[in-house]
UniProtKB/Swiss-Prot annotation:
Catalytic activity: D-glucose + ATP = D-glucose 6-phosphate + ADP + H(+)
Gene field: glk
Source species of the chain: Shigella dysenteriae serotype 1 (strain Sd197)
GO term, biological process aspect, one: glycolytic process
NCBIfam families: glk (TIGR00749), PRK00292.1-1 (NF001414), PRK00292.1-3 (NF001416)
The protein's Enzyme Commission number: 2.7.1.2
Residue sites binding ATP per the record: 8-13
Gene Ontology CC terms, in alphabetical order: cytosol
Family note: Belongs to the bacterial glucokinase family.
Entry protein name: Glucokinase
Length: 321
């Protein structure tokens, strides 16, 4: 067996590749490539392997799209490929293609305390189910359970469940967005584009015309307190994040913790801490006490997707995490 495996974390914009020490799980030599610069994922992998001059026979790539069979077509990119064909072309003995939040969930057992920031709740209960979700280009969701000394990730497309408002303001947001786009999923409000949707709906609810803002613009104006609409949008984003996380906690009794990943929340960490997130997380009526002690953590590891891809592959190859 070779010392290293190839691991990857591929989103709608970038492909991040690295080497994973098969024995220890340590990630090294990570490099990010723009997806727009390459015709295929295989082309990116070939460039990476050529640059690093290392023999690799095993690989695991996490991708931001559903993985339901051999054919993979990315949701937010034009890349599409056959897993079996790419494995053959690269000369790999083993190639795993997994959902990006499967990878993030598999990273959780590998994380240390310094990789986490806690938002309320008590200590996690060992051996109990775990939920992980995160907003970025879209909204990713997965669960993690421990069975027979193995970690089992339960991937899905939970980001596309219905947006479920629980206040008058949220109901108005739903009404406006439904008139524009039809079905309003949670991802339509909990993502970068979702933050824009919240801003636009807030402005339109007041019979005004919204500006053509990007997620970055809304966040910057909200933090600078220079735009009331942007601040309202960001505050509402935090509240809906809390409601959604609380729903995940109820679904599977995640007393092992609820973990937040994705690139959006760390950009306004202090704002998030002071927001209505935790109150919304616990706002479950008769089941408020049920979720009260469930801890929520923000993952602040720079390469959680790569770490989890490596963990998934190592476990598949017979290692105990």
């Amino acid at each position: 067996m070779t010392k290293y495996a190839l691991v990857g974390d591929v989103g709608g914009t970038n492909a991040r590749l690295a080497l994973c020490d098969i024995a220890s799980g340590e990630i090294s030599q990570a490099k990010t490539y723009s997806g727009l610069d390459y015709p295929s994922l295989e082309a990116v992998i070939r460039v990476y392997l050529e640059e690093h001059k290392v023999e690799v026979k095993d690989g695991c790539i996490a991708i931001a799209c559903p993985i339901t069979g051999d054919w993979v077509a990315m949701t937010n990119h034009t890349w599409a490929f056959s897993i079996a064909e790419m494995k053959k072309n690269l000369g790999f003995s083993h190639l795993e293609i997994i959902n990006d939040f499967t990878a993030v969930s598999m990273a959780i057992p590998m994380l240390k305390k310094e990789h986490l920031i806690q938002f309320g709740g008590a200590e996690p209960v060992e051996g109990k189910p775990i939920a992980v979700y995160g907003a970025g280009t879209g909204l990713g969701v997965a669960h993690l359970v421990h069975v027979d000394k193995r970690w089992v990730s339960l991937p899905g497309e939970g980001g596309h469940v219905d947006f479920a408002p629980n206040s008058e303001e949220e109901a108005i947001i739903l009404e406006i967005l439904r008139a524009e786009i039809g079905h309003v999923s949670a991802e339509r409000v909990l993502s970068g584009p979702g933050l824009v949707n919240l801003y636009r709906a807030i402005v339109k609810a007041d019979n005004r015309l919204p500006e053509n803002l990007k997620p970055k613009d809304i966040t910057e104006r909200a933090l600078a307190d220079s735009c009331t609409d942007c601040r309202r949008a960001l505050s509402l984003f935090c509240v809906i994040m809390g409601r959604f996380g609380g729903n995940l906690a109820l679904n599977l009794g995640t007393f092992g913790g609820v973990f937040i990943a994705g690139g959006i929340v760390p950009r306004f960490l202090e704002f998030f801490k002071a927001s209505g997130f935790r109150a919304a997380f616990e706002d479950k009526g008769r089941f408020k006490e049920y979720v009260h002690d469930i801890p929520v953590y923000l993952i602040v590891h720079d390469n959680a997707g790569l770490l989890g891809s490596g963990a998934h592959l190592r476990q598949t190859l017979g290692h105990i995490l």
